[in-house]
């Protein structure tokens, strides 16, 4: 159903993440129903794998689990909700930008191209809240984890 590589999820995730998976997947399921048209147009983008990859990359503590600053100080559920809705809204933006020519695909693989688009918005290089310059690693790390986690 989820088309995931459970061995890699176990191997490349920390034990603290394992207990979060049911909640994260329930939220993905909930919003997948609400945004069914987006999901249907982009069946190749695995939101389960993407959610786990972003959670692992952000590695945030309580109240900032997904790195969503707009929901800072909340909890895993609220962070996951903001993250999943952000993924879905950015799929729409990516589709529109690609269609209108303001985004030139950078990968032949649509999934990796979308993650690149998302990463430019989610973790922009040179952002004021990234003084150590770690955002430069966000896109390649999320792409790698995404591919490891999906089947």
PLM segments and residue spans:
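Non-catalytic cell-wall polysaccharide-engagement segments
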Residues: 1-19, 26-31, 70-151
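A short, structure-level motif marking secondary-structure boundaries and short turns
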Residues: 20-23, 35-37
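Conserved interaction-surface patches within small, structured recognition/assembly domains
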Residues: 33-43
